[in-house]
């Protein structure tokens, strides 16, 4: 068995619509839907935009963590479309959670003081230049921004 190795894929900056759609308390926790308004991504092998075509079905859990469930599209700079889906977790202190309603305050939080991780998967056309993404399991390290969220995404080798 070998150690985990990664390869940097891209950094993505996603803009989320305000206000979020608040469902409220459910048997599973407090549900919110954050709509993707747009964004950009760029890396050594791929770059492009994130059209307004997806969202994050966020669940604030009873244990104080946040479960994320994202589905979105990526459009490469050469016109190809890629579907991405990922789950993940955000874990932060109750004081930090209080900043989530204010984007400027959320961006001011030091990302090293909270845990924000994702596990992206991709679907690309099998006959296209990004078919290699169909075989990638990735991990993302996230941070909160004034416009939404940003991630550095790495392929697991």
Predicted regions and their residues:
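Beta-strand-enriched cores of mature, soluble protein domains
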Residues: 1-157
């Amino acid at each position: 068995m070998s150690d985990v190795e990664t390869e940097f894929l891209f950094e993505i900056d996603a803009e989320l619509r305000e206000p979020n759609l608040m469902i409220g308390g459910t048997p599973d926790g407090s549900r919110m839907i954050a709509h993707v308004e747009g964004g950009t991504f760029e890396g050594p092998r791929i770059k492009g935009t994130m059209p307004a075509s997806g969202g994050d079905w966020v669940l604030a859990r009873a244990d104080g963590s946040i479960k994320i469930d994202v589905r979105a599209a990526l459009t490469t700079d050469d016109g190809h479309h890629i579907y991405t889906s990922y789950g993940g977790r955000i874990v932060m202190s109750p004081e930090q959670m209080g900043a989530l309603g204010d984007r400027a305050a959320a961006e001011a939080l030091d990302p090293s003081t909270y845990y924000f991780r994702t596990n992206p998967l991709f679907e690309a056309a099998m006959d296209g230049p990004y078919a290699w993404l169909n075989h990638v399991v990735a991990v993302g390290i996230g941070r909160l921004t004034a416009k939404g969220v940003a991630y550095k995404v790495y392929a697991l080798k």
